[in-house]
């Protein structure tokens, strides 16, 4: 979502939960990175990009519409790792893996057949509402959200700048959850540098969240 304007972008995101780590990333980023790791796929990607530009159908470009980041929650090590491509720089940022300070509410609703409860928190300068399913005993969720007694099936900030909602679930026939090594060389940076580089890359200035931590 464009938090500084009125345009909204939607993208299919993937949350994969393993015994020791979880992954969260855009499906289109994974698709493109997989293509780039194969010479034939790389040529196909180039052809798709050229066709999109020539036809001015920019929505068909084989690139992520919102984020190319990969997020990993490492349970044993207690850290969240973000792998990001900022401009031409491959970056790796590590943070402490902590839970949000959730406050449970009385509201309930059904999401994909699961009875969900409402929880609220303030995180990184925004107020969030999350709907979690107690019958799915995983204290996980999209992006950096976690720490509720059930899987988070929907979460959004109160201004609806960011909104994640479950569209499907698969439990059988999946590959083991692991770190993807699409880009072997990363520059390790801290969160403040990451936010500065992100602001510079978007050319939209520094948003309120970044100002809070600088």
Language model region names:
Residues 111-112, 123:
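Structural motif
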Residues 117-181:
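Gly/Pro-enriched, hydrophobic low-complexity segments
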């Amino acid at each position: 979502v464009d938090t500084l304007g009125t345009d909204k972008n939607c993208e299919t995101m993937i949350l994969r939960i393993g015994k020791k780590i979880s992954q969260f990333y855009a499906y289109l980023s994974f698709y493109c990175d997989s293509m780039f790791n194969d010479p034939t796929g790389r040529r196909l990607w180039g052809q798709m990009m050229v066709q999109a530009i020539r036809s001015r159908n920019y929505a068909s470009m084989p690139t992520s519409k919102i984020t190319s980041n990969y997020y990993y929650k490492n349970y044993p090590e207690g850290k969240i790792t973000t792998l990001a491509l900022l401009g031409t720089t491959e970056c790796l940022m590590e943070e402490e893996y902590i839970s949000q300070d959730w406050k449970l509410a009385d509201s309930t609703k059904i999401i994909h057949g699961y009875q969900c409860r409402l929880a609220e928190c303030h995180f990184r300068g925004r107020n969030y509402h999350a709907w979690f399913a107690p019958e799915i005993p995983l204290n996980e969720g999209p992006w950096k959200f976690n720490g509720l007694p059930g899987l988070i099936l929907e979460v959004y900030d109160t201004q609806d700048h960011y909104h994640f909602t479950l569209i499907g679930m698969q439990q059988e026939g999946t590959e083991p959850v692991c770190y993807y090594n699409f880009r072997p060389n990363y520059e390790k940076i801290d969160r403040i540098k990451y936010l500065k580089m992100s602001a510079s890359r978007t050319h939209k200035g520094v948003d309120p969240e970044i100002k809070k931590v600088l």
